[in-house]
Amino acid sequence: QEPGDFMSLTFSAVLFDVDGTIVNSAPVIMGAFRSTLSDFGLEIPDDQRLRTYVGPPLWYSFGDLGYSGQLRADLVSRYRERYMDHYLDPEPFDGVRDLLWDLHHAGVPLATATSKQTPMAIAQMEHLGLADAFDVIAGATPDPGSSKTTVIHEAIARLGAMGADVSHPVIVGDSIWDVRGGHEAGIPVIGVGWGYATEDGLDDAEIVCETVEDLRALLMPAGC
């Protein structure tokens, strides 16, 4: 997509998805799905399908695989155990770490908006040395009703409570879940092309940045 008038906008706060946007976490997430399904003696989908579960809420993913009721709850619980073994392993995509710090130093309010649970998101950002770049680290709750939209609402509310300008927020993400969540929350979406989006997953984003430098040009305040 062409930048068009979107390039002229100034965003008062920026929310970032984590998996597929900040960190390259597909191998760990897909591995946790394989281990979980194997533990229960269930069929393991091929990699192409597993990759579509990098980013969505767990309750959706296991439901999409055809599981419901107590079995789905048990799968979600076991997945979280398996994921805990390796969730600190993924590294940031090239250039993302520097961009986050540069935005922070430029005074741009930053928050995560991730479908992983908040304690894990905090621990991961601390492990990567990025926790202090964010004003707010917001993630999901164990509640099946927790969604990307609810996380975005929470991130914006917490930023606002700190005194940040949240009049023109934007979310940066790599999947259809970020697009849907952002639009359901009433904010624009910047898609990134280095994550795990399906072919048409970012079609409804206001703009797609194929590189970190494209994203930098869009987000950095003038004169920085």
Mark where each language-model region is.
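Hydrophobic residues in well-ordered beta-strands that form the structural core
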Residues: 24, 46, 112-114, 191
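Residue-level detector of anion-binding/catalytic polar loops
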Residues: 43, 109, 188
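N-terminal helical cap/lid subdomain that shapes the substrate entry/recognition surface
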Residues: 9-106, 119
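A generic alpha-helix signature
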Residues: 28, 74, 114-116, 147-150
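Short, surface-exposed loop/turn motifs that are enriched in glycine and acidic residues
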Residues: 86, 110, 141-142
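Short loop/edge segments at beta-strand edges and connector loops
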Residues: 94, 114, 210
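Asp-based, Mg2+/Mn2+-dependent phosphohydrolase catalytic module
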Residues: 3-12, 101-104, 118, 122-224
